[in-house]
Amino acid sequence: MTKTRTLVLIPARMAATRLPGKPLLDIGGLPMVVHVLRRAETAGIGRVAVATDTPEIAAAVTAHGGEAIMTRADHPSGSDRVFEALDRLDPDGRIETIINLQGDFPTIRPDIIRDVLKPLADPAVDIATLAAEIHSDEEATNPNVVKAVGSPVAPRRLRALYFTRATAPHGDGPRYHHIGLYAYRRKALQRFVELPPSPLERQERLEQLRALEGGMRIDIMIVDDVPRGVDTAADLETARRILASVPIPKLAYPRSNL
């Protein structure tokens, strides 16, 4: 995937109830969403932008040298927001691959962002995502931890069969913690947003099931650990401690290069 053909989009909203204003919370002098943006830039994949329906988020991103695109407020999922942003940023269709990166991963390693592209080297794959092996019963039984169930197709790679909040699969063997980072082929993203919400998507509250129920192929790259998301005040303090000792990446791929 070349830089000019790959776009990283970070959907960000002010809708969090446990941490109000989450994208703009300060971590070491920068808003959280700017940390995510800069780590995506450091991955060296290509152009990076924040997709938001909130003027305050857009203003904060641009004030720190990043790129933001305003989107509608009524999208049913982050993927729908990403598709609108793609269409507005690249109306001529030059971008071939889109990465959807959650805006609450301020400590994510750039190499993990690059890893999500690897399954798309197989032309049969529509969407790629990540997972890490689960090592505790607490994690395996936690409904807030989404489990990825799949069949091995290559070393450290699965073909997704299902995603669930339940403990799965049953019995002995590895279980995997799904990581909410996606890479889409452009046509696959368009097909996904054109599909209606599916029954299992509604039941599990997992939008990726819409793709599986629609007959799309999702492959999962296995990585060593789960990036630390920020959902609670305790998570925020942990991120602040981690980033206090880590240099802040500089923006590396200016918006004019697309």
Curated annotation (Swiss-Prot):
GO terms for cellular component: cytosol. Gene3D superfamilies: Spore Coat Polysaccharide Biosynthesis Protein SpsA, Chain A. Its main location: cytoplasm. Pfam families: CTP_transf_3. Keywords: Cytoplasm, Lipopolysaccharide biosynthesis, Nucleotidyltransferase, Transferase. It comes from the Bacteria. The keyword Endoplasmic reticulum does not apply. One of its GO terms (molecular function) is 3-deoxy-manno-octulosonate cytidylyltransferase activity. GO terms for biological process: CMP-keto-3-deoxy-D-manno-octulosonic acid biosynthetic process; lipopolysaccharide biosynthetic process. It catalyses: 3-deoxy-alpha-D-manno-oct-2-ulosonate + CTP = CMP-3-deoxy-beta-D-manno-octulosonate + diphosphate. The keyword Nucleotidyltransferase applies. Pathway: Nucleotide-sugar biosynthesis; CMP-3-deoxy-D-manno-octulosonate biosynthesis; CMP-3-deoxy-D-manno-octulosonate from 3-deoxy-D-manno-octulosonate and CTP: step 1/1; Bacterial outer membrane biogenesis; lipopolysaccharide biosynthesis. It is an enzyme of class 2 (transferase). It is found in: Cytoplasm. Activates KDO (a required 8-carbon sugar) for incorporation into bacterial lipopolysaccharide in Gram-negative bacteria. NCBIfam families: kdsB, PRK05450.1-1, PRK05450.1-5. Belongs to the KdsB family. This is 3-deoxy-manno-octulosonate cytidylyltransferase.
